[in-house]
Amino acid sequence: MGNGKIFIQIASYRDPQLIHTIRDCDMKASDPSKLVYSIAWQHSNDDEWDQIHEFKNDPRFKVVDIDYKDSKGACWARNQLQQNYDGEQYTLQIDSHHRFVQDWDLELIEMYNQLKEKGHEKPLLTGYVSSFDPDNDPAGRIQTPWKMNFDRFIPEGAVFFLPASIDNYKQLTEPIPARFYSAHFAFTTGDFVKEVPHDPEYYFHGEEIS
């Protein structure tokens, strides 16, 4: 049996939404005690909007403290925080600007197990999460879920994606197969952190196809 814990990966770069994201994630979880946060905190001491001192004494939080001038990019930051993985059963990788539904953890675990029961050994739930308005939440949330579509190749060879609506989502009873991986929202087995770590040599574009 697994430990039921979720290793939450957040790479943040001077993001005014970081604190709100953490609070909402914790508040909306059915069991916050099962959450383990690993945060790459790329910040300036002069910034006031992303100070995470309120979580300093919470043993669930593992913070990689990085001066923003020393950052080597999103992929490097994600790789840094992945070093804190300690055998949690699941992992959730998100950006530092998100909002959640009530009992989001139960929803994700249920979908994950649903796919396992259908024969998928290590299912991964991913996609572009619909937008929200931080000044008008939850009323300002886009309610239609998105999928990832190919957009174009840039001259350097990296592939760009764009979100597109899942038109028949109200008729769906289970997740649909995805063609691409989104680094800004991914939920799967915790083993993913060790088996498919982020390549620290990528800066930003290219991380999702690497």
What spans do the regions from the language model cover?
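Catalytic cores of eukaryotic secretory-pathway lumenal/extracellular enzymes that build
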Residues: 1-210
